[in-house]
Amino acid sequence: MEDADGLSFDFEGGLDSGPVQNTASVPVAPPENSSSAAVNVAPTYDHSSATVAGAGRGRSFRQTVCRHWLRGLCMKGDACGFLHQFDKARMPICRFFRLYGECREQDCVYKHTNEDIKECNMYKLGFCPNGPDCRYRHAKLPGPPPPVEEVLQKIQQLTTYNYGTNRLYQARNVAPQLQDRPQGQVPMQGQPQESGNLQQQQQQQPQQSQHQVSQTLIPNPADQTNRTSHPLPQGVNRYFVVKSNNRENFELSVQQGVWATQRSNEAKLNEAFDSVENVILIFSVNRTRHFQGCAKMTSRIGGYIGGGNWKHEHGTAQYGRNFSVKWLKLCELSFHKTRNLRNPYNENLPVKISRDCQELEPSVGEQLASLLYLEPDSELMAISIAAEAKREEEKAKGVNPESRAENPDIVPFEDNEEEEEEEDESEEEEESMAGGPQGRGRGRGIMWPPQMPLGRGIRPMPGMGGFPLGVMGPGDAFPYGPGGYNGMPDPFGMGPRPFGPYGPRFGGDFRGPVPGMMFPGRPPQQFPHGGYGMMGGGRGPHMGGMGNAPRGGRPMYYPPATSSARPGPSNRKTPERSDERGVSGDQQNQDASHDMEQFEVGNSLRNEESESEDEDEAPRRSRHGEGKKRR
């Protein structure tokens, strides 16, 4: 297909029509004029062969026929790195012949010789990891195989000196020298001299590289030894894995040289301290997946040793008494590096799965400690050594660092226990003062309605459900009003409210500073006994009366702080209080029952302070109990 301007868009139209020639480009169909073809083809062939072949310096990089082009599947065209011509001399090697040494296909067009395959260098050295699948030729050498040391030495030489003996590296070094000289003045005598210089440079470079490799592979023994960490003590050792709940306690132990474990583990460590020369503690902080170091136990547990303001986690057992330790090694050893170590003393589980003060089998503990010494020191090692030197200096000066007077921040364990007991007692007192129905927290929160029993005779109207619990107590949770037991002020100066937040709910819900102030013209007396309240016929719920004004400094709907159980029989007979009233016992019981039906909830919604202030409240409840029994 040709355009009007003579442009051809048939890219591979002349692939099979042109003559076969040893060019890298795709052959183009010759024009119709044979004379012009004879003139143009020969220079084109010579030019391509000269440029591609590099003027006789080597074969073209397109020296192998493209396998995909033979099957008509190559889509790269001129960009393909293989030859798109059928040339038997440049055919690729048959894969079956390369893998199995034979090819059973009669019409196979590929090569069946190993001459053009490059020799495998790894196989020449003695071992090829690719085996029979290697793309290079495996030529067996005569004689016995070389020793392993010689093979390793040759491999090291290849990896070390490959950069110095690389042809590209040599060409880069020689190219600037050749470019500096004129093209026509390159003498033939200079070539041996340059080659000799190159050989000398190549000999010097391997020596230098060998010296550098020896320095890197064989580190200085002085640098290899840890100057800061202390070696493991000689003798009989017992090893224990110690768990720390947090990193703060671990760093505090590094600074002060003490540790404290749970009281259940103290006997175990004391027994080990008395039985062997050295007790080695290998520490691991929880949730770090690392071992942080090891220390030697230097004192029994039981004597007073100052220091260690340990941080307790919520819900964990408290620590026991302090004991001194000497830090030997501080580092970061990953659990992954200890995955092959298992502890026979712990059901043969990995050492990373250990409880606090879990003893390790001596050989396993020694291996774990040796792994710690292979890791570099952490920053805490220098801190530990500095703190230890400071303690030694203070001992030399006669200063006792464990003195309580000189260390006011350090509190002994027994004093800690006493303070904690006092705090618990004070918290219990505050909770008892706060009252149960105010919720779990301290202070005036939202008050939950108590499950109070209804007064005697309280029944809902016919056809209605029972009264919900939310209306029988402080369910409004209105945050304002008079201050409570803790003296909370009235933020808006509202004073006591006559009703709840949404008006009166029941017949006895009128409680205000002035009776009837919300309903002018109504009598200030209470609702008649057994009359119609706001709930209709029958007895209304006795939630107090209109004349029952709230008391200052007390919440209006405060629930009772005591249980609703009746008082004991000791309060039933109170002759002193009955004499004060000047009436008989029967009259007192009748008055008490009548008063309690009207003031039952109002009296029950008072706390223990009101009971202690007013002497008339307790006898009413006790006598009301007798009245019920006599009825």
UniProtKB/Swiss-Prot annotation:
One Pfam entry name: YTH
Residues bearing the modification Phosphoserine: S610, S612
The keyword Phosphoprotein is annotated on this UniProt entry: yes
The enzyme's E.C. designation: 3.1.21.-
An example Gene Ontology molecular-function term: zinc ion binding
Keywords for this protein: Apoptosis, Cytoplasm, DNA-binding, Endonuclease, Hydrolase, Hypersensitive response, Metal-binding, mRNA processing, Nuclease, Nucleus, Phosphoprotein, Plant defense, Repeat, RNA-binding, Zinc, Zinc-finger
Biased composition (Basic and acidic residues): 392-407, 573-583
Biased composition (Acidic residues): 412-432
Protein name in the entry: 30-kDa cleavage and polyadenylation specificity factor 30
The organism's taxonomic lineage, starting at the top: Eukaryota, Viridiplantae, Streptophyta, Embryophyta, Tracheophyta
